[in-house]
Amino acid sequence: KEGYIVNLSTGCKYECYKLGDNDYCLKECKLQYGKGAGGYCYAFGCWCTHLYEQAVVWPLPKKTCN
C-alpha cells in the first residue's frame, strides 16, 4: 500500500517542498508506519511506500484539512 501521510488530528497531509528524495518525509513515514516504510516528496506532500494494508493515509473520511 502507498499513500500520503496524514495528521490524524487535523486531516491534513504532511507538506514538503523539496520534491523527490526527502529526508523529512522518509523520517515521518518511518515514525508513523514503521521502519519498513519508505517516503519521498510528491506534489508537495509526503508520500509513503511499503505500508501495511490497514495503514491510515490521506484523505480521512469525514475529516477535511482546515
UniProtKB/Swiss-Prot annotation:
One of its GO terms (molecular function) is sodium channel inhibitor activity. Signal peptide: none annotated. GO terms for biological process: defense response. Residues 1-66 form the LCN-type CS-alpha/beta domain. It is found in: Secreted. SMART domains: Knot1. GO terms for cellular component: extracellular region. Keywords: Disulfide bond, Ion channel impairing toxin, Neurotoxin, Secreted, Toxin, Voltage-gated sodium channel impairing toxin. Transmembrane segments: none annotated. Is susceptible to be neutralized by human antibodies scFvs 10FG2 and HV. Disulfide bonds join C12-C65, C16-C41, C25-C46, C29-C48. Expressed by the venom gland. Its main location: secreted. InterPro entries: LCN-type_CS_alpha_beta_dom, Scorpion_toxin-like, Scorpion_toxin-like_sf, Scorpion_toxinL. It comes from the Eukaryota. Has the structural arrangement of an alpha-helix connected to antiparallel beta-sheets by disulfide bonds (CS-alpha/beta). Beta toxins bind voltage-independently at site-4 of sodium channels (Nav) and reduces peak current and shifts the voltage of activation toward more negative potentials thereby affecting sodium channel activation and promoting spontaneous and repetitive firing. This toxin is slightly toxic to mice. Belongs to the long (4 C-C) scorpion toxin superfamily. Sodium channel inhibitor family. Beta subfamily. This is Beta-mammal toxin Cv1. It comes from Centruroides villegasi (Scorpion).
